């Protein structure tokens, strides 16, 4: 009994497609299938991008049951842990979950500046005993092939899986069992996300793959009649970046000039449309913190919406509908304090609102939200208190503690030698005075 991915098990027996008679191929590969090597293998295209014309990648002459995984970061290895890496396919038991990922080196194209750019490769999964390496044993060291199998599968026998007929079977969006660790620097085609999200259910890739497959099967050549290729989106993006003089692989550096331009661009917006960030702080956008603007403190005032804690607070922000229909609104005309006296004065209005955001402890991330709110609500009061406290006098280098304290306390004129109680040697005059003090006192009765 053969199994068909995406369908229930059927009694259809395998028609011997693995021998090469029934496998669908690209039109330009029809002659290669007739050539047989001495070891009985079908002639396979080389897996290097330089094996054909500079603008073409290696050919994938077999249809995979699943959408591909595309590399978007250079230098990242394509690998899975042992027992992982086989996509989920309804109708295929775990004993048949074995096969390999095949690297498809895509074509290169010429950029606007005349240079050739090689697109990063894309990987496709084939069950053991099918695809471009149907004759190879599991675990054979082959460049551009990564073998995967579940723990329940017997890798010594081919998988009993039918080959995909693109005219009747669409490609299945690639998904993996929970707990699968996916290679970094790759994304699953059709999911719009990087490979770490293995639960995508998008069918965009399957429709695109099926449409392209039918076009190739009906037209008899590799060039679709519409002129649209799978790599056209990448080519267009690269051409646009080259035209603008930008490189998508290099991070954009923010200089003082660009930071000033960003800040001015934000400040030119209406007050209710501003989003503070590193280049334009909260105080620059909305002024100092106080009783009427009492949220924000510490790093959040410096980083604004760039603060790592801000996204979880943004989940509490009301929608436009909740703002208008769930708040108390009041329209008031205010004095226009902007502009010169020579300029015509404009009527300025304020739409004042009063509302509330209600949530409970069942909200996801409740503890973190409460922590962030407690740290930032009325934080200006704590900062003002710290500013009002007299700072502790700092001791200068090389100065003793006692000396510093005496200098800070003594602000009057210097003391005399007697007040300072400093010891010194007695002079002859001092000794004479002391003797007179010891003599008995006699009253002078002489008349003046």
Swiss-Prot record:
Residues 266-384 are annotated as: Dimerization. GO terms for cellular component: host cell endoplasmic reticulum-Golgi intermediate compartment; host cell Golgi apparatus; ribonucleoprotein complex; viral nucleocapsid. The modification Phosphoserine is found at residues 167, 191, 390, 423. Residues 266-276 have a biased composition (Basic residues). Residues 9-22, 193-223 have a biased composition (Low complexity). Keywords: ADP-ribosylation, Host Golgi apparatus, Phosphoprotein, Ribonucleoprotein, RNA-binding, Transcription, Transcription regulation, Viral nucleoprotein, Virion. It comes from the Viruses. Residues 52-194 are annotated as: RNA-binding. RNA binds at residues 106, 122, 164. Residues 61-190 form the CoV N NTD domain. Residues 422-439 have a biased composition (Basic and acidic residues). Residues 29-38, 45-55, 399-409 have a biased composition (Polar residues). It is found in: Virion; Host endoplasmic reticulum-Golgi intermediate compartment; Host Golgi apparatus. Homooligomer. Both monomeric and oligomeric forms interact with RNA. Interacts with protein M. Interacts with NSP3; this interaction serves to tether the genome to the newly translated replicase-transcriptase complex at a very early stage of infection. Belongs to the betacoronavirus nucleocapsid protein family. This is Nucleoprotein. It comes from Bovine coronavirus (strain LSU-94LSS-051) (BCoV-LSU). The lineage of its organism: Viruses, Riboviria, Orthornavirae, Pisuviricota, Pisoniviricetes. The gene is N.
